[in-house]
Amino acid sequence: MKLLLLHPAFQSCLLLTLLGLWRTTPEAHASSLGAPAISAASFLQDLIHRYGEGDSLTLQQLKALLNHLDVGVGRGNVTQHVQGHRNLSTCFSSGDLFTAHNFSEQSRIGSSELQEFCPTILQQLDSRACTSENQENEENEQTEEGRPSAVEVWGYGLLCVTVISLCSLLGASVVPFMKKTFYKRLLLYFIALAIGTLYSNALFQLIPEAFGFNPLEDYYVSKSAVVFGGFYLFFFTEKILKILLKQKNEHHHGHSHYASESLPSKKDQEEGVMEKLQNGDLDHMIPQHCSSELDGKAPMVDEKVIVGSLSVQDLQASQSACYWLKGVRYSDIGTLAWMITLSDGLHNFIDGLAIGASFTVSVFQGISTSVAILCEEFPHELGDFVILLNAGMSIQQALFFNFLSACCCYLGLAFGILAGSHFSANWIFALAGGMFLYISLADMFPEMNEVCQEDERKGSILIPFIIQNLGLLTGFTIMVVLTMYSGQIQIG
């Protein structure tokens, strides 16, 4: 036995056993560190010491503790129920939590009350309900901070609408140049520019705003650019195929002139009809108050067909002296003029709605929408002016009614600002986005192709094709730049 006690291995095992027993004793461990023993009550006392006074907390001090933990920040009066019980996975307000524990303004929360309140705090933290509530509140605060002031909204809105409305007065300035080649090519560029801006504005800004998300998030801009790329790819491919097929057909029929020599060309036929228009032979195309002063005869059937193929500018140029030298009674003005004026006024009202709602969101949202509408209104107002003249109005009347319909944009601006300031503007953005897509693709795209037909008949296909591409890509680039860098450019 003595030998066993003196054995080194036994002594080592005994020493390790005694050391283990000493380490597992809390008092021994605490005394080894020179620190007092930690108890469960110590944590409660620490909270009361940091947030309260003495040995208790007031209701406001407990609320400060909850705010620090992001608990009790709900809107209050929660009425959600799940199978007859209140949904506890909801962010409650501090008032709701205090009511559940029968706390009043005069209550003092001591250790026992705080210990009973701790499971409530733990449940709210575990449900993470208040985390999403805080994120939503922060996003709302950031949105409110980013919104322009009322002065900026009305000031920039009125300025943009005024510039757009002045486009209606530009129609008279271009009448002398309507027969020039550069006028039709300039008009072609502006139509293509309008298509690019309207389509891109709806794609990059109006549609995402209608659905309520930021277009700069989740690669939306790059994906929308691919959507525009698909549209542009098919447009480019179709035009190239038409150019190649036209050249092939011309080469194939290059020696078949015997049939066409016996018939006058379409250009010669149109020039003959224009000469008759100037001489007053086609009196049914001229207003009654003018045809009574001119000698006329009934046109042939072929001449009616040719007249139908003439552009509005051709007819207007032949009748300009009759329209401009004499006043026109309202009863002599065609119904088409009043239909154009009313429809244009409604169109401008919706444009104003889109501009007003856009400026309530941000200044750059309003500017980008205004740029798209301006690019669309410039060729649109020029075309309306010519149609009003051709329908029987004098220059003064056409300018007045064209400007009057343009002023409907002011009324739409006021409604858009009021609706965007007090209600959700998403519905207005959805309406404007659909309208922009329709105008660009269903209305202006065929008009762009129609303007190109005369150049295509003359054989100059490449120049109109280049102008179309420049207009489309310019409009697309403007909208992309305004969308990508709207938050980095400061105004004022």
Curated annotation (Swiss-Prot):
Question: What would changing residue 98 to V do, according to UniProt?
Answer: In HMNDYT2; no effect on protein abundance; no effect on subcellular localization at the plasma membrane and within the cytoplasm; decreased manganese ion transmembrane transporter activity
Pfam families attached to this UniProt entry: Zip (PF02535)
Which GO terms of the cellular component aspect does the record hold? Answer: apical plasma membrane; basolateral plasma membrane; early endosome membrane; late endosome membrane; lysosomal membrane; membrane; plasma membrane
Domain of life (superkingdom): Eukaryota
Which UniProt keywords are given for this protein, alphabetically ordered?
Cell membrane, Disease variant, Dystonia, Endosome, Glycoprotein, Ion transport, Lysosome, Membrane, Neurodegeneration, Parkinsonism, Signal, Transmembrane, Transmembrane helix, Transport, Ubl conjugation, Zinc, Zinc transport
Disease per record: Hypermanganesemia with dystonia 2: A metabolic autosomal recessive disorder characterized by increased blood manganese levels, neurodegeneration, and rapidly progressive parkinsonism and dystonia. Affected individuals present with loss of developmental milestones, progressive dystonia and bulbar dysfunction in infancy or early childhood. Towards the end of the first decade, they manifest severe generalized pharmacoresistant dystonia, spasticity, limb contractures and scoliosis, and loss of independent ambulation. Cognition may be impaired, but is better preserved than motor function. Hyperostosis cranialis interna: An autosomal dominant bone disorder characterized by endosteal hyperostosis and osteosclerosis of the calvaria and the skull base. The progressive bone overgrowth causes entrapment and dysfunction of cranial nerves I, II, V, VII, and VIII, its first symptoms often presenting during the second decade of life.
Family of this protein: Belongs to the ZIP transporter (TC 2.A.5) family.
Q: Know the name of this protein? A: Metal cation symporter ZIP14
Q: Which gene encodes it?
A: SLC39A14
